[in-house]
Amino acid sequence: MSKIMAIVSFKLPQKQTLDQATAMFQATSPKYLNMPGLLRKNYFLTEDGMRAGGVYLWESRQAAERVYTTEWKAFVKSKYGNDPEIVFVDTPLLVDNERGRISSL
C-alpha cells in the first residue's frame, strides 16, 4: 500500500518574506516532531509570498485525518486568517537523488 501525501495550503492575509514565513513555521514545527503516522513535512511559501502551507507524507490517510480535525482547521484559520485547503494524493514511488535510489513507498 502506498503512502499518502497531503498538500495543505492557505492564503496569507498579507505578503510574507521567506524570513517571516520561516519564523512563523518555526513556531508550529515542534508539534509535528514525533507525530504518530507523520513521516515527513516540508513547509512552503509561494514566490509571491501570499500562500503558504505544508507537504506532508503520512503512513496512511487515517493518520492524516486524525490530525486534520475541525479544531486543527480552526487553529490554522485563526493563525493565518484563512481556511486551509487539503489535497490528498497517493505516492507510490520515490526518486531519491540524495541516496541515489528509486523505491516504492
Question: What name fits each language-model region?
Answer:
Residues M1-A52, R61-T70, N82-L105:
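Short S/T/G/P-rich N-terminal loop/turn motif that feeds into the first structured element of a domain
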Residues K73-K79:
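A common structural junction motif
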